Regions:
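Outer-membrane beta-barrel translocator domains and adjoining extracellular loop/strand segments
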Residues: 39-51, 90-104, 136-149, 181-192
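Outer-membrane beta-barrel "beta-signal"
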Residues: 28, 161-162, 201-215
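Residues that define the transmembrane beta-barrel architecture of outer-membrane proteins
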Residues: 25, 51, 57-63, 107-111, ...
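Transmembrane beta-strands of outer-membrane beta-barrel pores
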Residues: 33-39, 71, 83-91, 109-111, ...
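Cleavable N-terminal export/targeting peptides
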Residues: 1-26
Length: 215
């Protein structure tokens, strides 16, 4: 899916630029790709009650698609309401000599709803502030309890530039702070004890480019 979205964006980018048309407004479909950096600050509480602290990070390129409604940009201030989906999954795996303590955690199917307030420099160029709510599914395997879904909030700054009469290009840079997640052992024989606990605070920084199509 990610490769398909990137290919579509690349193809559209090299289409001949059309003359600017009327101010964009109404329903739209959007395809985007983002460079993402994930940081997790956390701690590990072992069987002896000792607590270890640490930070891990990872980068990735993701694809997304969304649907939204944009009010007319003919006025100085306009608004954009939307919903976006980031398909795919990412796995974190921990193994040891004792296979009974092996654990895999998978985060998948990220979603976001958002509200955007735009300051319109012209009918074809806008800058904006975005606020959004984010959710993702978490699946675990191994002798550990599922910490539940992942939820958070996003703040971002961006630009929207009209491209022809019914398309636009969006650029955006933002940060998503997820709620703290915590998982404990199930305590099965030979597995992970119930007094073992892992806690993490995930944060995502990203830069995004997207192309939108007005219906």
């Amino acid at each position: 899916m990610k490769k398909l979205l990137v290919s579509i964006l690349a193809s559209l980018f090299f289409v001949s630029y059309a003359n600017a048309g009327p101010s964009l407004s109404g329903l739209y479909l959007e395809l985007g790709t983002a460079a993402v950096g994930v940081e997790m600050d956390g701690n590990f509480n072992d069987d002896d009650g000792d607590i270890s602290y640490g930070t891990v990070g990872k980068t990735a390129v993701t694809g997304s698609y969304g649907l939204g409604f944009m009010t007319s940009r003919e006025k100085p201030i306009s608004f954009d309401l939307g919903y976006a989906v980031t398909p795919g999954s990412a796995k974190i795996k921990a193994t040891s000599d004792n296979t009974a303590t092996d654990v895999t955690m998978e985060v998948s199917d990220g979603t976001e709803w958002y509200v955007v307030a735009m300051a319109n420099i012209t009918e074809d160029a806008s800058v904006y502030f975005k606020y959004g709510g984010n959710d993702a599914d978490i699946t675990v395997t191994g002798d550990i309890n599922n910490p539940g879904g992942l939820s958070g909030t996003t703040v971002a700054l961006g630009t929207v530039m009209s491209w022809g009469s019914n398309m636009y290009i969006r650029t955006e840079a933002g940060k998503t702070d997820y709620d703290q997640i915590s998982a404990t052992g199930k305590g099965t024989a030979g597995g992970i004890g119930t007094d073992v606990k892992v806690t993490a605070d995930p944060t995502v920084h990203y830069g995004k480019i997207a192309i939108g199509f007005k219906f």
